[in-house]
């Protein structure tokens, strides 16, 4: 029976050791572990771990690899001149640990751990750092809208921030949106056929749970033909007393407003005083004061409003009464002579007496 000699055993062991050494020397460096994606707040701390194998003879780098790569470390030496960064190496686990304190918004991005084998051959692993940022509504969002009644309106709202902000639409005073709800979620709010009732202030609200969010006010103007309402279509007043005739006009753009009687346009003079008062939401109150009413001034008056989208008119009838109406005749006295005062006084006394005896 053949038995190996001692010299043969030594030779075999030596060959095995050489084979193992060559095999190990030929092993390609690998990255066995890299920290998973990190999400941090501004001012916080993050640590990236990169574990390597078979890389003792190679250079290991940390880089920030966004548009322009920034070298942070080489081997166990920190390269970046920023006191917020630090680097440690754990030889037991062959792990490089890159730490960033007091995280800033600009620290967000992709970090790469890289083993340099040659100028053309590298082994890399990446980890992404996301930094929570409050929403900021972008300048390319809608600022304001002017549209004709019946046309389509589209409002857009975009915001930066992390996590991605949610965009919610509201109206002033929580009025119902054209979508038939108090709120609408989405970057674009569409009104297929805008009505004058849709005008007003809309709020674009961006929120992602970081800070208090951001808001933009968008003013929507709707162009439409005038609409006139008359609070008191018939008014009575006694002779020689003032009387105010009123009409309310709703229109955009602001209309031209005139008062007429018997197809003759009235103007400010000793008989009439015309005033216009613009209120919010495209309303205008127009008042025609008839000064010391005369017989010929009783009858129909027309309030007419016109803009480039159309026109409207409404009538107000002024009729004669015996007793003065207050307002606007409160405290007003007309003295044309003693005879007039006496006649008026006797007339009023007679009316009051008749009313008393009738009981």
Curated annotation (Swiss-Prot):
PROSITE patterns: IG_LIKE. The keyword Transcription regulation does not apply. GO terms for cellular component: neuron projection; plasma membrane; septate junction; side of membrane. Pfam families: I-set, Ig_3, V-set. Glycans are attached at residues 92, 140. Residues 29-130 form the Ig-like V-type domain. InterPro entries: Ig-like_dom (IPR007110), Ig-like_dom_sf (IPR036179), Ig-like_fold (IPR013783), Ig_I-set (IPR013098), Ig_sub (IPR003599), Ig_sub2 (IPR003598), Ig_V-set (IPR013106), Neural/epithelial_adhesion (IPR051170). A lipid is attached at residue 336 (GPI-anchor amidated alanine). Residues 1-25 form the signal peptide. Residues 337-359 form a propeptide. Residues 135-221, 226-317 form the Ig-like C2-type domain. GO terms for molecular function: protein homodimerization activity. It is a lipid-anchor; GPI-anchor. Disruption phenotype: Flies exhibit more sinuous tracheal branches and uneven lumen with numerous breaks in the dorsal and lateral branches. It is found in: Cell membrane. Expressed on differentiating neuronal cells from the onset of neurogenesis in both the central and peripheral nervous systems. First detected in the cellularized blastoderm, apart from in the ventral side. Expression persists uniformly in the early ectoderm until the end of gastrulation. From stage 10, expressed in an alternating strong/weak pattern in each segment until stage 15 when it disappears. From stage 11, expressed in subsets of neurons and later subsets of glial cells. From early stage 13, strongly expressed in trachea, hindgut, foregut and the nervous system. It comes from the Eukaryota. CDD domains: Ig. Required for normal tracheal development and maintenance of the trans-epithelial diffusion barrier. Functions as a homophilic cell-adhesion molecule. May play a role in early neuronal differentiation and axon outgrowth. This is Lachesin. The gene is Lac.
């Amino acid at each position: 029976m053949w038995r190996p000699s001692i010299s043969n055993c030594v030779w075999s062991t030596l060959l095995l050791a050489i084979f193992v050494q060559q095999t190990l020397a030929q092993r390609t460096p690998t990255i066995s572990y890299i920290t998973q994606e990190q999400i941090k707040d501004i001012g916080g701390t993050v640590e990236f771990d990169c574990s390597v194998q078979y890389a003792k003879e190679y250079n290991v780098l940390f880089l920030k690899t966004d548009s322009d790569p920034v070298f942070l470390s080489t081997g166990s030496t920190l390269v970046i001149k920023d006191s917020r960064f630090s680097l440690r190496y754990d030889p037991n686990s062959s792990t490089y640990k890159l730490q960033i304190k007091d995280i800033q918004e600009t620290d967000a991005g992709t970090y790469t751990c890289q083993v340099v084998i040659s100028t053309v051959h590298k082994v890399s692993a990446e980890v992404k750092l996301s930094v929570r940022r409050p929403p900021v509504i972008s300048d390319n969002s809608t600022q304001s809208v002017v549209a004709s009644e019946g046309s389509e309106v589209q409002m857009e709202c975009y915001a930066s921030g992390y996590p991605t902000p949610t965009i919610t639409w509201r109206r002033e005073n929580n009025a119902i949106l054209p979508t038939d709800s108090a709120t609408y979620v989405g970057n674009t709010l569409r009104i297929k056929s805008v009505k004058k009732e849709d005008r007003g202030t809309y709020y674009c609200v961006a929120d992602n749970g970081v800070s208090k969010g951001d808001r933009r006010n968008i003013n929507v103007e709707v162009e439409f033909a005038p609409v006139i309402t008359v609070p008191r279509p018939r008014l009575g007043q006694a002779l020689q007393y003032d009387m105010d005739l009123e009409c309310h006009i709703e229109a955009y753009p602001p209309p031209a407003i005139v008062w007429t009687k018997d197809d003759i346009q009235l103007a400010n003079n000793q008989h009439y005083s015309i005033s216009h008062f613009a209120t919010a939401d495209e309303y205008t109150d127009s008042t025609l004061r008839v000064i010391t009413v005369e017989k010929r001034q009783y009858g129909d008056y027309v309030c007419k409003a016109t803009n480039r989208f159309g026109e409207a008119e409404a009538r107000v009838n002024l009729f004669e009464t015996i007793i003065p109406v207050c307002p606007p005749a409160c405290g007003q006295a007309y003295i044309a002579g003693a005879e007039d005062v006496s006649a008026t006084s006797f007339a009023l006394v007679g009316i009051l007496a008749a009313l008393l005896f009738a009981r």
